[in-house]
C-alpha cells in the first residue's frame, strides 16, 4: 500500500506520485502585501485632498524654484571661490620663492635701489590722484555753469510780467540761486584739492629724478628683480580682484536664498492664518436636560414646567387617584403634587426618596399594588366626583 505523505498544499499524496508545482501567479495576493518598491509608487506619492489642492498657493512653487536656484548658485560660486583662493595662494608662494632666489643672486644692489622704486610708486599714485582731482574740478565747474544758466532763466521769467510777481518763478529763482552757491563751493573745493595733489605729484617727480641721478648704477643692476616683482604684483592684483568679485556673488546668492526662505515662511504663516480663520465653528448639538441630582437652570425650569403641564393634560385619560379633596381643588392639588415630584427628581439622586410618594403617583404608569388599589377603590366609592389621574414620568 502506498504510503501517504502530507504536502504543504493540504492534500495527501501517495509516495512516488509527484504533486504539480503551484504556479506562483495563481496564488492570490493580498493587496496590502504587494511589492512596496515597484508597485507602490502611487501609494508613496502623497495625494492632496481637494481642499489642500485648492489652498495650494502658486507662490510656493515659485519661491521653491528661487530657493533651488540660489542654492545651486551658492554651491557653484563657492567652489569657484575656493579654486580662486587656492590659485592666489599658490601664485603668492611661487612669486615669493622666485623673488628670494633673484634677490640672493643680485645682492645688496636691491636694497640700494629700493628707495628709487618706492619713490616711483608714490609718484605714480600722486599722478592718479591728480587726474581724479582734475575730473572732480571739471564736474564742479560744469555744475556751476548749469546753475548760473538756471538763475538767468528764472530771472527772465520773474521779469516777464512787471505788474505781477509769479510765486512759481520766484521759487525757481531761489532754488537756482541755492544751486549756484553750492556749485561755487564745490568748484572752489575741487580747485584747492587739485592744486594740493598737483604739488604732491611735482614733489614726487622731483624726488624720483634726484634718486635716479644718485643711484644710477644700483638701479641698473637691480632692474630684473623689480621688473619681476612688478609682474607678480599685477598677476596677484588680478587674482585678488577675481576673489573679491566671487565673494560678492556668494553674498548676493546667500541674500537671495534668505529672501526666498523668508517669503516661504510668510506664505506658510498666511496659509495657517487663513485656515484657522476659515474653520467653521463647532456645531451646537441638541440641548441635553440636566441629569438627576443636578440643579436646573432657569431654562430647564421652564422646560420642566411645560412638561409637567403637558403631563397633567395627558393624565386625564388614565386612572389614578391623587388624593381626597373637593372637585374644584383637585386640579390645583394635582399640579402642586406633580411639581413637588419634579423638584424631588431634580434634587435627589436616590430612588428611595420616591417610595413615600407611591400613595399618590405611579412612576411607571402601572398599578402600584393591592393596598394602593384598595385605597383608591374605597376613596373612589366615597367620592364619586373625583377625577382619576395617572402620571407617567
Curated annotation (Swiss-Prot):
Residues 1-58, 273-332, 362-393 are annotated as: Disordered. Residues 59-140, 169-272 form a coiled coil. GO terms for molecular function: guanyl-nucleotide exchange factor activity; protein kinase inhibitor activity. Residues 317-332 have a biased composition (Low complexity). Pfam families: SH3BP5. Keywords: Coiled coil, Guanine-nucleotide releasing factor, Phosphoprotein. Residues 297-306 have a biased composition (Acidic residues). One of its GO terms (cellular component) is cytoplasm. InterPro entries: SH3BP5 (IPR007940). Residues 18-28 have a biased composition (Basic and acidic residues). It comes from the Eukaryota. The modification Phosphoserine is found at residues 30, 49, 343, 350, 358, 362, 378. Residues 384-393 have a biased composition (Basic residues). Transmembrane segments: none annotated. The modification Phosphothreonine is found at residue 13. GO terms for biological process: intracellular signal transduction. Functions as a guanine nucleotide exchange factor (GEF) for RAB11A. Belongs to the SH3BP5 family. PANTHER family: SH3 DOMAIN-BINDING PROTEIN 5 (PTHR19423), SH3 DOMAIN-BINDING PROTEIN 5-LIKE (PTHR19423:SF8). This is SH3 domain-binding protein 5-like. It comes from Homo sapiens. The lineage of its organism: Eukaryota, Metazoa, Chordata, Craniata, Vertebrata. The gene is SH3BP5L.
